[in-house]
Regions:
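Negatively charged, low-complexity tracts enriched in Asp/Glu with abundant Ser/Thr
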Residues: 1-35
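Short stretches within intrinsically disordered, low-complexity N-terminal or propeptide regions
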Residues: 10, 19, 42, 54-55, ...
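Residue-level detection of beta-strand scaffold positions
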Residues: 24-26, 52, 71-74, 88
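Hydrophobic beta-strand residues in large extracellular and virion-surface proteins
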Residues: 30, 37-39, 50-54, 78-80, ...
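Short aromatic-glycine-(Arg/Gly/Cys) micro-motifs in beta-strand/loop hairpins
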Residues: 37-72
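A short, charged, amphipathic alpha-helix used as a generic interaction element across diverse proteins
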Residues: 63-71, 77-92
């Protein structure tokens, strides 16, 4: 199992889904071009509890029902969701 898959399992996020699936389970889901960004909260005692995940569309359907796959998960946790979003937007 690679590090990205391990983090997805730890944060309890799917490796494949639809944007609609993410929106029903997570509060911050942003469609940005051919990517979908998810920002979540995962408690950690050091106080940095926010993480980000970047999904990419796997087909031509870029609606809420399009199929997406996990491309990146932040190894670092952030102090707030804004910094997590910033990280996600900077991923190629």
């Amino acid at each position: 199992m690679n590090k990205m898959t391990e983090l997805a399992k730890e944060y309890r996020i799917p490796t494949q889904a639809t944007p609609e699936d993410l929106e029903t389970r997570w509060g911050k889901v942003i469609t940005f071009g051919d990517r979908v960004i998810l920002v979540g909260y995962y408690y950690h005692p050091d106080g940095n509890c926010y993480f980000a995940a970047v999904y990419e569309f796997l087909d031509d359907d870029h609606t809420c029902e399009g199929f997406i796959g996990l491309r990146e998960v932040s190894y670092k946790r952030f102090e707030d969701d804004g910094h997590a979003i910033e990280w996600a937007l900077n991923q190629n």
